[in-house]
Amino acid sequence: MGIKGLNSIIQQQVPSAIRPREMKQFFGRRVAIDASMSLYQFLIAVRQADGVQLASADGETTSHLMGMFYRTLRMVDHGLKPCYVFDGKPPVLKAHELDKRTERRKETEQKLAELTEQAEIMKHERRLVKVEQWHVAEAKKLLGLMGIPYVDAPGEAEAQCAELAKKGKVFAAASEDMDTLCYRTPYLLRHLTFSEARKEPIHEIDTELVLQGLGLSQEQLVDLGIMLGCDYCESIKGVGPVTALKLIKEHGSLENIVEFISSGGNAKWKVPENWPYKEARALFLQPDVLDAEGVSLKWEEPKEEELIAFMCKEKGFNEDRIKSGIQKLRKGLKGGVQGRLDSFFKVKPKTTEQLAASARKAQAAKKTNQKGKVLKRR
């Protein structure tokens, strides 16, 4: 689900933190991609002309394989070095969100049985799409044969992507979920795995610019995300995005906000009973991840014969197209070795204290500018 309204806040308050990019601008960059999110996109978007998912001769869905093969090939062809990160065990706090998703699926299934118009049927069928374990297993097999590295995260994939980016193993984390920013990735790439047909630019979000522009520390950004609504707990009823940002700036932390509301700050706002915001905060600030220093990412020569056997003989893809793709893959992986000049210099991420100081400085500058405007009017 991500975090409701965070992208809108950044667009309105700090538009300069979101840069539209073309894929070629990431030549030589290593990028950690949220695999589960990508597979979900492929299962939704990669379809035949009649809207039905691609399938092999025995009727098994192959949309996830086509999406994974060709979108990865496109990235490599542009000089990117993609690696995929798969979800591990979800945190206990996420159980309520997963239960809600299951309930929504049941409601959709019931409604689907009552529909008669084909367009409505197709729309609701897409809402039932779910990434199964066999989709994941086949995607891993495909990546292994392509020579593309992947990481099995112990917990949330976005958190592991952010960990790899923080430690300099990759340039950025790629996901559609805005909660990736709360795990402190230096950069978040959105729309990276979208199809070319959608003509959506890649959005590169600079986390440090977001913090400076909003005048928040990393901890306060996490508290804002929890207030807006995340996968780990409910939000405060009656508090929208604008109010949430205002409260964080005025009171500094969720502890102070809860105290303010509980003491009668606003009768319309209601803090959920036994609200586990502290536990949710800990999941963002101390997530369950593999230490990036111990993770090895290697891009290897594709295994052509095994790849053709799997994709063509077993799954029914066109052999000439797969062979052509393998040649592009081989060429792209060799070309990516050239790399970028700035990849030879490891950028040391700022400490929590440095980020907090930057946020205070930005906030002070903003207040000074506002005072200057008032004096000019006088």
UniProtKB/Swiss-Prot annotation:
Domain of life assignment: Eukaryota
Biased composition (Low complexity): 356-367
Keyword terms: DNA damage, DNA repair, DNA replication, Endonuclease, Exonuclease, Hydrolase, Magnesium, Metal-binding, Mitochondrion, Nuclease, Nucleus, Phosphoprotein
Top-tier EC class: hydrolase
One annotated GO molecular function: 5'-3' exonuclease activity
Residues the record lists as binding DNA: 47, 71, 156, 229, 231
Principal location: nucleus
GO cellular component, one term: nucleolus
Known EC number: 3.1.-.-
Cofactor note: Binds 2 magnesium ions per subunit. They probably participate in the reaction catalyzed by the enzyme. May bind an additional third magnesium ion after substrate binding.
Described function: Structure-specific nuclease with 5'-flap endonuclease and 5'-3' exonuclease activities involved in DNA replication and repair. During DNA replication, cleaves the 5'-overhanging flap structure that is generated by displacement synthesis when DNA polymerase encounters the 5'-end of a downstream Okazaki fragment. It enters the flap from the 5'-end and then tracks to cleave the flap base, leaving a nick for ligation. Also involved in the long patch base excision repair (LP-BER) pathway, by cleaving within the apurinic/apyrimidinic (AP) site-terminated flap.
Family note: Belongs to the XPG/RAD2 endonuclease family. FEN1 subfamily.
Name this polypeptide is given: Flap endonuclease 1
